[in-house]
Amino acid sequence: MPVGTAVHEKTFQLCESLSYREWSGYYAVSVYETHHEHEYNAIRNAAAMIDVSPLHKYRISGKDATKFVNRVITRDISKVAVGQVIYCCWCDEQGKVIDDGTISRLGENLYRWTAADPNMRWFHQNALGLDVTIEDISNQLAALAIQGPTSGRLLKQACDADIANLKYFRHTHGRIGGVPVDISRTGYTGDLGYEIWIPWNEAPKVWDALVERGRHFDLHAAGILALDVARIEAGLILIEVDYSSSKKALIESQKYSPYEIGLGRLVDLKKEYFIGRAALEGENRTGPRRLLTGLEINWDDVERLYDAIGLAPRVPDTASRVAVPVYHGGLQVGKATSTTWSPSLKKMIALASISGEDAAPGTQLQMEFTVEATRHKVRATTRGLPFFNPPRKVATPIV
């Protein structure tokens, strides 16, 4: 049975919908009100606070910590400075992705690693012969994401750290409400945003301090439904939705390489040995058989389907995590894995896994679309990702 996070007593007081979902053994708010509209608008137009404490978190230390990290991930951690954060993935020997997450370099041989799934056993299996300590600190460290255009100004008021000059994918230290915290300029919304890493038992104090300061910046608590829409707009993948971990895949077609899910840029074939390198070198030469791409669904086609049965077109209430077939010339060439109506773009969009020859931007495809339990096809055009990428996301300084 799930348990509450470090700030469950705070989120529960605000959760009018009483709508929760299980996330890594914790209760996570799906939506605070009866609809996530206000929460989404906070992410895109003001500031939103999201409890991301259920993330799996690890502390890597010891003389061989850097060597261990480089053995496991596809990027070269030796190029990463202390104070920097990277997004990365890690693979099995066949070059298929096990998980993705972020690594913060806290010291020369000290790292904080976040992941979607549990990885402790696999980490230990690949640390043999190394002087490295791997600690699961998931229930010692809470995390709050502050995301949105006013998030930087809010944190400038709430924290004693130099937030104004904190660069994208860097981290710093400070105090909020008298509590020592780490702050990284990272997030899962594709917008200006930060993640605050807090000692578990001190998290309610930080929540209260942010709420108090946030009154002047239109801060709202936001749940998973609003976050889902934002991350699709940002072109950010979700494990077990847009790809399957190779540890859980039952058949080969359920396994994905970094090149197949838009993470090819994270593969550094110039560095020393890492797990999966040989397989990825081969795929780099031949090219992946499928690619992650964006889809823009033709809304005129959707309207015509509703018109034909005498109904007004219906904008989907929530993002869909159900895979639906995508066709080209009557043949299935892939699937849309995450689909949503984008309130900011006023378009229906999707993340899709499409065969390489059909994934070029501007390709006209068809996507399955169901109206009143009847399946149809609507036109969909491939395009690059992300759909939404505001300059403020990476701008420095924050004013």
Per-region residue spans from a language model:
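Conserved, structured C-terminal
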Residues: 1-15, 20-23, 28-31, 104-399
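Acidic, proline/glycine-enriched N-terminal capping motif
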Residues: 1-91, 96, 292
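Residue-level micro-sites within transmembrane alpha helices that shape
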Residues: 50, 98, 301-303
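Acidic active-site catalytic centers that drive phospho-/nucleotidyl reactions
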Residues: 51, 100, 195
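Well-ordered mid-protein domain cores that form the structural environment of catalytic cofactors
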Residues: 71, 75-129
